[in-house]
UniProtKB/Swiss-Prot annotation:
Pathway, per record: Purine metabolism; GMP biosynthesis; GMP from XMP (L-Gln route): step 1/1
Gene: guaA
EC number: 6.3.5.2
Record key words, sorted: ATP-binding, Glutamine amidotransferase, GMP biosynthesis, Ligase, Nucleotide-binding, Purine biosynthesis
Active-site residues annotated for this sequence: 81, 176, 178
Alphabetized Pfam families for the sequence: GATase (PF00117), GMP_synt_C (PF00958), NAD_synthase (PF02540)
A single GO molecular function term of this UniProt record: GMP synthase activity
Name of the protein in its database record: GMP synthase [glutamine-hydrolyzing]
Limits of the Glutamine amidotransferase type-1 domain: 4-202
Catalytic activity, reaction form: XMP + L-glutamine + ATP + H2O = GMP + L-glutamate + AMP + diphosphate + 2 H(+)
CDD domains the record matches: GATase1_GMP_Synthase, GMP_synthase_C
Species of the source: Paraburkholderia phytofirmans (strain DSM 17436 / LMG 22146 / PsJN)
Binding residues for ATP: 230-236
Length: 527
């Protein structure tokens, strides 16, 4: 059994980053809503508890509070932003609405010698004060610390920026150690988890494979499992893990909706059927999907049609596998968190997980989610350890509706063919162009890159003739979390090379443009 850190979510947009940072220290962590009951907290038996930030104000009476059981467990507690304010208010301190709000970069002076911040600093002032570069995002602030607490850090506008009760191992930070802008944030969280909580650093993907395989075998027994294989990272890793556990008891259904990347169907079949020996049923449903999409231009309508048709095709194939008792899905931990948090007071409003839908009930199958405890980076690491090609495991995200939302307006087979080839040229070029400074390919230096088909024509000149052909836009972004993103400053030489190749090799396109919009205001995908 792994040591665990319990993270209570008060609605922060970056709560998932806390769990990721803890797991990066090789300690298992889980996120749960702030209002879980006392018996759950006791049964969870955490080595420590972290209270997340959130958008509410503890100065109001009906806003979230920390379960009293947290303070009675006898384990270390770390409150972050709202979590610190709630801790202060509930333990006898005072919190007030701040007249000077702090949003963004701040320099914090560490005070006193506390076990959480001892020896952690970014620079020292001429007066000899240790300083930290941190990220703040708060309006309210603690005016008076509860009994037993000592000042741990301060800023000019926030005299109590951090506090500590060393006897009970309760700590509060007004800044966010989980975001990369807080330079020493990782060191602070590792100090709390490993030294103060004393958690064992034994959460590793190598160990996870053995544990997951044993758990799947115990859960499934001799029964058969079906999995919808999309070719994406999550379903691919789920298939590899399940095959490792139950072999021929697994059958994958790969639905080709005609909106995949160039040669993607062949690559999926080669990897799973030929290389790994997984049983895969390949369904070419492209004609059906394209027929249903004819005349449809609204992006949301296209998504719904593709989603509904996928369910119908998958259901028809799965219905033929009469001995199957389980439906496996590539649900990962962020999907679980988002679905659980939906509708919770104080929580951010996020989509519910689209994978699950109503398929298990419709097919009268039991649901199997072997990756539901893992974050995306952990899923990728697991995939490599299971023998999947790194090029597949580490490739950029691809939307479920595929090229259907990268063809603006109506989806046509000709448009999909043009876009497929243009996109392949762009990706191939990103892989081959190496940045001299880092030694990495531009594909590895970007978080997501793709081509978009624009349903407009422009005048061009090729040879001695006039052309009137379509336009393709290129999009490449860099991001840590996909919540915000910067457009990638690709070398002009690379962009020129891509443009020349697309115009010369993809008949029907005579103009290539590059999208230099960030997120926000633009989204990463165009539709």
């Amino acid at each position: 059994m792994h040591d665990k850190i319990l993270i209570l979510d008060f609605g922060s947009q970056v709560t998932q980053l806390i769990a990721r940072r803890v797991r990066e220290a090789n300690v298992y962590s889980e996120i749960h809503p702030y209002d879980v009951d006392a018996s759950f907290i006791r049964d969870f038996a955490p080595k420590g508890v972290i209270l997340s930030g959130g958008p509410s104000s503890v100065t109001e009476t009906d806003t979230p509070r920390v379960p009293q059981a947290v303070f009675e467990l006898g384990v270390p507690v770390l409150g972050i932003c709202y979590g610190m304010q709630a801790m202060a208010e509930q333990l006898g301190g005072k919190v007030d609405i701040g007249h000077l709000r702090e949003f963004g970069y701040a320099e914090v002076r560490a005070r006193n010698h506390t076990s959480l911040l001892e020896g952690i600093k970014d620079f020292t002032t001429p007066e000899g004060h240790g300083m930290l570069k941190v990220w703040m995002s708060h309006g309210d602030k603690v005016l008076e610390m509860p009994p037993g607490f000592a000042l741990m850090a301060s800023t000019e506008s926030c005299p109590i920026a951090a506090m500590a009760d060393e006897k009970r191992h309760f700590y509060g930070l007004q800044w966010h150690p989980e975001v990369t802008h807080t330079v020493q944030g990782r060191a602070m969280l590792e100090r709390f988890v490993l030294q103060i909580c004393g958690a064992r650093a034994d959460w590793e993907m190598g160990n996870y494979i053995d544990e997951a395989v044993a758990k799947i075998r115990e859960q499934v027994g001799n029964e058969h499992v079906i999995l919808g294989l999309s070719g994406g990272v999550d379903s691919s890793v789920a298939a590899a893990l399940l095959h490792r556990a139950i072999g021929d008891q697994l059958t994958c259904v790969f639905v080709d909706h005609g909106l995949l990347r160039l040669n993607e169907a062949e690559q999926v079949m080669a990897t799973f059927a030929d290389h790994l020996g997984v049983k895969v049923i390949h369904v070419d449903a492209s004609e059906v999907f394209l027929r249903k999409l004819a005349g449809v231009t609204d992006p949301e309508a296209k998504r719904k049609i593709i989603g509904a048709e996928f369910v119908e095709v998958f259901q028809a194939e799965a219905g033929r596998l009469t001995d199957a008792k389980w439906l496996a899905q590539g649900t990962i931990y962020p999907d679980v968190i988002e679905s659980a948090g939906k509708g919770k007071k104080g929580a951010q409003t996020i989509k519910s997980h689209h994978n699950v839908g109503g398929l298990p009930e419709t097919l009268n199958l039991k649901l199997l989610e072997p990756l539901r405890e893992l974050f995306k980076d952990e899923v990728r690491e697991l995939g490599v350890k299971l023998g999947l090609p790194p090029a597949m495991v580490y490739r950029h995200p691809f939307p479920g509706p595929g090229l259907g939302v990268r063809i603006l307006g109506e989806v046509k087979r000709d448009f999909a063919d043009l876009l497929r080839r243009a996109d392949a040229i762009f990706i191939e070029t990103l892989r081959t162009f190496i940045d001299k400074e880092t030694g990495k390919s531009w594909y590895d230096l970007t978080s997501q890159a793709f081509a978009v088909f624009l349903p407009v024509k422009s005048v061009g000149v090729m040879g001695d003739g006039r052309t009137y052909e379509y336009v393709v836009a290129l999009r490449a972004v860099q991001t840590l979390d996909f919540m915000t993103a910067h457009w990638a400053h690709l070398p002009h030489e690379l962009l020129g090379h891509v443009s020349n190749r697309i115009i010369n090799e993809v008949r029907g396109i005579n103009r290539v443009v590059y999208d230099i919009s960030g997120k926000p205001p633009a989204t990463i995908e165009w539709e």
